[in-house]
Amino acid sequence: MKYKLVLAVAVLVFSLPSQAERIKDIANVQGVRSNQLIGYGLVVGLPGTGEKTSYTEQTFMTMLKNFGINLPDNVKPKIKNVAVVAVHADMPAFIKPGQDLDVTVSSLGEAKSLRGGTLLQTFLKGVDGNVYAIAQGSLVVSGFSADGLDGSKVIQNTPTVGRIPNGAIVERSVATPFSTGDYLTFNLRRSDFSTAQRMADAINELLGPDMARPLDATSVQVSAPRDVSQRVSFLATLENLDVIPAEESAKVIVNSRTGTIVVGQNVRLLPAAITHGGMTVTIAEATQVSQPNALANGQTTVTSNSTITATESDRRMFMFNPGTTLDELVRAVNLVGAAPSDVLAILEALKVAGALHGELIII
C-alpha cells in the first residue's frame, strides 16, 4: 500500500484597514500602563503531591521561624503537602489600594500537582523592590495528574499552574504622568509616519492648530489642560476621535514550520521565470494601452496583464488569468506538490532577483 503525504501551504491574503479607527484602538497613552508584580511563596495542603527539595525545606523552616516556632537543627520536617511557587500578577494603571488582583501561581520545584492547595501570604513586588500587593488564597487548577503502580502516568492540561481570582490585595498604587506636565503623548501600537501625521491632523482639526504634533513614527504629543480635573474628559474626547490608519508596507510573512504564508495587499511581482528542482514557474507580463477617440473627452489608460505557468517534469502546467498576484504564484507552486521549504526558497530567490516588491519576513 502506498501512502501519499500531502503538504498544504495555507495562503492568506489580508487587506489592510481603510476604515476609520478610534484613537483608543490604535494607540496608548504614554505612561498609562500595567506593571508586573512577582513573589515567592508556599502552597500548602497538597494531597501528597508536594516536593521534598532542600529549598522547600528551607523556605518552610523560615516560615515556621517567622511564626516563632524553632525546630532543633538535627530535625528535618517530612513534608509532602508543601510546594514552593512563583506568584505573579499584572497591576493595571490607576488601581487603588484595597482593590483586588488576579494572580497566577506556578510550581518552582518537583511538585506533581497544585490541585487542592492554598497559597500562604506572599508579598508581590515590582521591579523597584517595593511591595505593591499581598496574595493569599485557594488555588483553582484546571489540570490533573495520576500515577499508577506500574509506572504509568496520566496528565491532563498543566496541574502545576493555578490561578487565584481576586487573590491579591493592592497595598500601594503606582504614580503615572497622567496628571503632571503640560502634554499628553499617544504612542501608536504600530509605528507609521503617515498614521502619526493623520492622528495629529485629526486632533488639530478638532482642537485647533498646533495642539498636536507628531514627534516620530510612534508618538503624537498633545497639549493638555493644566487643570487636572479636566484631563479625564479631554482624553475621553480624544480617544474616541476617528483616524484612518495608513496602509501598511508590502509584506510577505512566511512561517517555515507550519507552511503558512501571509501575503500583503500591496505586494507586487515583476515578470520572472523560476526553476526549482524539477519544477518550473514562469511569470510574464504584457502592457495594454487604451487610447480613446480624439473627439471623445476621455483619458488614455494603461493596464497590465500577467500570465503565470507552473510545470514539473511530468509536464503538468497551470495557466492563470491576467492579473497575477503573489498568492496565485504560491498556489501554483503548491498545486504541483511543492513542500513549504520549496515555496520559501522560491520566495527568497524572487526577493534577491528584485522580482518581489515587498518585505519578506520569515518567522
UniProtKB/Swiss-Prot annotation:
Subcellular localization: Periplasm; Bacterial flagellum basal body
One Pfam family, short name: FlgI
GO biological process, one term: bacterial-type flagellum-dependent cell motility
GO cellular component: bacterial-type flagellum basal body, distal rod, P ring; outer membrane-bounded periplasmic space
Signal peptide: 1-20
InterPro entries named among the record's database cross-references: Flag_FlgI
Subunit structure: The basal body constitutes a major portion of the flagellar organelle and consists of four rings (L,P,S, and M) mounted on a central rod.
PANTHER family: FLAGELLAR P-RING PERIPLASMIC PROTEIN FLGI, FLAGELLAR P-RING PROTEIN
Family: Belongs to the FlgI family.
UniProt-recorded name of the protein: Flagellar P-ring protein
Organism: Shewanella baltica (strain OS185)
